[in-house]
Curated annotation (Swiss-Prot):
Residues 247-307 are annotated as: Disordered. GO terms for cellular component: dense core granule; extracellular space; neuronal dense core vesicle; secretory granule. The modification Sulfotyrosine is found at residue 153. The keyword Secreted applies. One of its GO terms (molecular function) is cytokine activity. It comes from Rattus norvegicus. This is Secretogranin-2. The modification Phosphoserine is found at residues 176, 270, 434, 534, 557-558.
Length: 619
């Protein structure tokens, strides 16, 4: 009877338990079905509400922390592939159940909140790639958790008062899937719900997608573009090589590109030309050709002017020698010299003899002796070949001009006298300037007619009549005195190292001449003083004086008249009568200015060519 009563009592308890459970499950399922019928979109929301493996790990971590706090060793076993937990061991031990309930109640709500927040922070800090790698399985929510099944942890809400009275085995509570979620829901129900946790998880996933894959996509696009351009370049190169092999090296490009390249090259060339012209102009301005000349350019111009003048002078010497050698001077010259010597020598004739001796580089006493003797010195004469006059001054070799003494040759003749300089050439002279004018400027207009009878054949005057200079004791026999017919401008511009020696020689020579011929004391002060210009009145007076002398000496020979006319040109009127009056200018100053102007034009042209060459070399 007792057993039957106990059995009945247990059955009654089971019935009561079933009575309380069945209406709750029916009500929950009925409410769920109504919601699903009204709002079909809730199915998708419910799919998202299922817990993810990350959430399960977080809860497991929370449970481990709780167990470590109470120093309890337990190994909860969750089967993620099953929606219903299966108890591994069933132990009915009331004491252990009471311990579990007491351990659950010991933790306060604040401690549970702190544990959950720490778990969420750790889940946020973990990268999504690590989480994906740690997944041991692929969760298929539709298969594992069907929508129609009401066996979810949200739907099965166990009332607390029932849980207190009911006793479940310990292992069942720890290994069940519902209990941890129920505990968390009971603790965090007011602040965090599974929906909020699911939204947070989705937000974290979206943030990970926005940060990571965007940069990867950009890098992929850049790499694809690079590969595409490299492929195009390779194709273009292969086509270009094939086209060059067929055509022969020409560029395989369209006409528009060729036209553009041509225009760019033209613009570039024009810019380069303009820059070169500007540089040339700047250099010319700096050098003083367009602006104020500096000292270096002045020295260069003087040097070039002296070279040009030396070329002209050497050419004129050769011209005079060639003209004089072609004429025969026989008995008439001897008679004229005898008549001159028979007459009493006045100051003008002596001055003329000194000038002739200077022009011919013969001492005056030797010249007088030759005129008196009337014989030809055979031992001092060398035959010379016919002279060939040059056509242009530039053909004169520079080796004979660049010497300090521009009239002294490198090699000497057999008699010890310098040979004639190199062959010269003569350009077209400017208007109003002729060979006779130049000879007049140089004081050699009548040298050909004054040739003595000692040189009837074709002999060079420089080689035949160049005698040893007159000096004390013949100590300086090999030196040649300064040429008298060098222009004053040339003598001023050409600096010579041995100028003092030549001045000393000239002083000794003049002193000996004054001792030997005291009549020259009055005419020694007649010096040639060049001035920048001559007035028309002076020219007219000199022309009248020359005409009067010619009329007075009309009975004499023509050569004597020319000699006296030359002397009258050299000696101004009134200079012998009154020494205090200023010296007159010479008629040959205008000719000299013309010659210098002509040389300056050549100098300017040569300077321009020189500057252009230097500019081209610098570029």
């Amino acid at each position: 009877m007792t057993e039957s009563k106990a059995y009945r009592f247990g059955a009654v308890l089971l019935l009561i338990h079933l009575i309380f459970l069945v209406p709750g499950t029916e009500a929950a399922s009925f409410q769920r079905n109504q919601l699903l019928q009204k709002e079909p979109d809730l199915r998708l929301e419910n799919v998202q509400k299922f817990p993810s493996p990350e959430m399960i790990r977080a809860l497991e971590y929370i449970e481990k922390l709780r167990q470590q706090a109470h120093r309890e060793e337990s190994s909860p076993d969750y089967n993620p592939y099953q929606g219903i937990s299966v108890p591994l061991q069933l132990k009915e031990n009331g004491e252990e159940s009471h311990l579990a309930e007491s351990s659950r109640d010991v933790l306060s709500e604040d401690e549970w909140m702190r544990i959950i927040l720490e778990a969420l922070r750790q889940a946020e800090n973990e990268p999504p790639s690590a989480l994906k790698e740690n997944k041991p399985y692929a969760l298929n929510l539709e298969k594992n958790f069907p929508v129609d099944t009401p066996d979810d942890y949200e739907t099965q809400q166990w009332p607390e008062r029932k849980l207190k009275h009911m006793r479940f085995p310990l292992m069942y509570e720890e290994n069940s899937r519902e209990n941890p979620f129920k505990r968390t829901n009971e603790i965090v129900e007011e602040q965090y719900t599974p929906q909020s946790l699911a939204t947070l998880e989705s937000v974290f996933q979206e943030l990970g997608k926005l940060t990571g894959p965007s940069n990867q996509k950009r890098e992929r696009v850049d790499e694809e573009q690079k590969l595409y351009t490299d492929d195009e370049d390779d194709v273009y190169k292969t086509n270009n090589i094939a086209y060059e092999d067929v055509v022969g090296g020409e560029d395989w490009s369209p006409m528009e590109e060729k036209i553009e390249t041509q225009t760019q090259e033209e613009v570039r060339d024009s810019k380069e030309n303009t820059e070169k012209n500007e540089q040339i102009n700047e250099e010319m301005k700096r050098s003083g050709h367009l602006g104020l000349p500096d000292e270096g350019n002045r020295k260069e111009s003087k040097d070039q002017l002296s070279e040009d003048a030396s070329k002209v002078i050497t050419y004129l010497r050769r011209l005079v020698n060639a003209v004089g050698s072609g004429r025969s001077q026989s008995g008439q010259n001897g008679d004229r010299a005898a008549r001159l010597l028979e007459r009493p020598l006045d100051s003008q004739s002596i001055y003329q003899l000194i000038e002739i001796s200077r022009n011919l580089q013969i001492p005056p006493e030797d010249l007088i002796e030759m005129l008196k003797a009337g014989e030809k010195p055979n031992g001092l004469v060398e035959p010379e070949q016919d002279l060939e006059l040059a056509v242009d001054l530039d053909d004169i070799p520079e080796a004979d001009i660049d010497r300090p003494d521009m009239f002294q040759s490198k090699t000497l003749s057999k008699g010890g006298y310098p040979k004639a300089p190199g062959r010269g050439m003569m350009e077209a002279l400017p208007d109003g300037l002729s060979v006779e004018d130049i000879l007049n400027v140089l004081g050699m207009e009548n040298v050909a007619n004054q040739k003595s009878p000692y040189f009837p054949n074709q002999y060079s005057r420089d080689k035949a009549l160049l005698r040893l200079p007159y000096g004390p004791g013949k100590s300086r026999a090999n030196q040649i005195p300064k040429v008298a017919w060098i222009p004053d401008v040339e003598s001023r511009q050409a600096p010579y190292d041995n100028l003092n020696d030549k001045d000393q020689e000239l002083g000794e020579y003049l002193a000996r001449m004054l001792v030997k011929y005291p009549e020259l004391m009055n005419t020694n002060q007649l010096k040639r003083v060049p001035s920048p210009g001559s007035s028309e009145d002076d020219l007219q007076e000199e022309e009248q004086l020359e005409q009067a002398i010619k009329e007075h000496l009309g009975q004499g020979s023509s050569q004597e008249m020319e000699k006296l006319a030359k002397v009258s040109k050299r000696i101004p009127a009134g200079s012998l009568k009154n020494e205090d009056t200023p010296n007159r200018q010479y008629l040959d100053e205008d000719m000299l200015l013309k010659v210098l102007e002509y040389l300056n034009q050549e100098q300017a042209e040569q300077g321009r060519e020189h500057l252009a060459k230097r500019a081209m070399e610098n570029m």
